[in-house]
UniProtKB/Swiss-Prot annotation:
Binding of S-adenosyl-L-methionine, residues: G31, G32, H33, D51, Y83, D97, Q104
Function text: Specifically methylates the N4 position of cytidine in position 1402 (C1402) of 16S rRNA.
Domain of life: Bacteria
Similarity comment text for this entry: Belongs to the methyltransferase superfamily. RsmH family.
InterPro entries: RsmH (IPR002903), SAM-dep_MeTrfase_MraW_recog (IPR023397), SAM-dependent_MTases_sf (IPR029063)
PANTHER family according to UniProt: 12S RRNA N4-METHYLCYTIDINE METHYLTRANSFERASE (PTHR11265:SF0), S-ADENOSYL-METHYLTRANSFERASE MRAW (PTHR11265)
Name used for this protein in its record: Ribosomal RNA small subunit methyltransferase H
Entry's Gene Ontology cellular component terms: cytoplasm
Keyword tags: Cytoplasm, Methyltransferase, rRNA processing, S-adenosyl-L-methionine, Transferase
Keyword flag Cytoplasm: yes
Biological source species: Buchnera aphidicola subsp. Cinara cedri (strain Cc)
A Pfam family that the UniProt record links to this protein: Methyltransf_5
Subcellular location: Cytoplasm
Gene name of the encoded protein: rsmH
Documented EC number(s): 2.1.1.199
Length: 307
């Protein structure tokens, strides 16, 4: 299965690209969004793409374009680096595609897929950090349960965590399909519309890569370094990250209605004036896109414009 960029046309429209602007694609992946952004940039425009997967970075290095640079690392660290590199000149647009790529899922040795057997690794950057199988081995039942509940919103987190912990005491779980079988046996009722391992794999991956902290940090950085009337565009794939982005936009978003309870106090006026962004809208994939690319079915595109 080849990687198809999700909501490509909608993303490019949302960025509202200025020909001579400076843009950041925080998640290069297979380069689909990056290549499309380059089509809209003028000769003096700049595009910086970031990825913490060395294989993706090596793909990016094959793009020979003086307007383009590929950077290896986490977007929470590399976005501020790009800002400083450009002498603190404000950015014209930032894109974050928060999903894992089809290429990563298809690589058995990465451990992201619950449909293929491979080593339980799950690190986006597999040159550093602890692989998933080692974390599961060293963790207590309570630690595993907490992660499954917090990051996977798994209703059977207690049953699954006990099953994982007890199995690891006898024999170390190192393979993806071994973990899948343990999950299946632990769950009393299987949802016919969702694979039983979906939430557990999601939770472990989020924990191993510290994805939520990364996202929250990057949201705060982005609204500080974007130009006025320029946009932050984010593609979310699961309810947890979608909720974080939605609430962040809501917290920092401009209030366009008059609050109840007149007269308005000075404190309320300051709160309204201090809003940093205008929430544009959210976009979901059309039925035609979902039919062509099933991966897109859970995607939500959220757009915020700086004030």
């Amino acid at each position: 299965m080849s990687h198809i960029p999700v909501l490509l046309k909608e993303t490019i429209n949302a960025l509202n690209i200025k020909k001579n602007g400076i843009y950041i694609d925080g998640t290069f992946g297979n380069g689909g969004h990056t290549k499309e952004i380059l089509k809209y940039l003028g000769q003096s425009g700049k595009l910086y793409s970031i990825d913490q997967d060395i294989k993706s970075v090596n793909k990016g290095k094959k793009i020979k374009d003086k307007r383009f640079s590929i950077i290896f690392g986490k977007f929470s660290k590399k976005i501020p680096y790009i800002y400083k590199k450009n002498k603190k000149k404000k950015i014209d647009g930032i894109l974050l595609d928060l999903g894992i790529s089809s290429n990563q899922i298809n690589q058995n040795d990465r451990g992201f897929s619950f449909m293929k057997n491979g080593l339980l690794d799950m690190r986006m950057n597999n040159t550093t950090g602890i692989p998933a199988w080692k974390w599961l081995k060293k963790s207590s039942q309570k630690e595993i349960e907490k992660v499954l509940r917090k990051y996977g919103e798994e209703r059977y987190s207690k049953k699954i965590s006990y099953a994982i912990y007890n199995r690891n005491k006898k024999k170390t779980i190192t393979q993806t399909l071994d973990l899948v079988q343990i999950i299946k046996k632990a769950i009393p009722k299987i949802d016919k519309y969702k694979h039983p391992a979906t939430r557990t794999f999601q939770a472990i991956r989020i924990h191993i890569n510290n994805e939520i902290k990364e996202l929250k940090k990057t949201l705060k950085i982005s609204i500080k370094i974007l130009k006025k009337k320029r946009r932050l565009v984010i593609i979310c794939f699961h309810s947890l990250e979608n909720r974080i982005v939605k609430n962040f936009f809501k917290k920092h978003g401009k209030t366009f209605f008059i609050p109840r309870g007149l007269p308005i106090t000075e404190k309320k006026i300051k709160k309204i004036e201090n809003k940093k962004i205008k929430i544009i809208k959210k976009i979901k994939p059309k039925k035609t896109e979902i039919q062509k690319n099933k991966r897109s079915r859970s995607a939500i595109l959220r757009i915020a414009e700086m004030l």
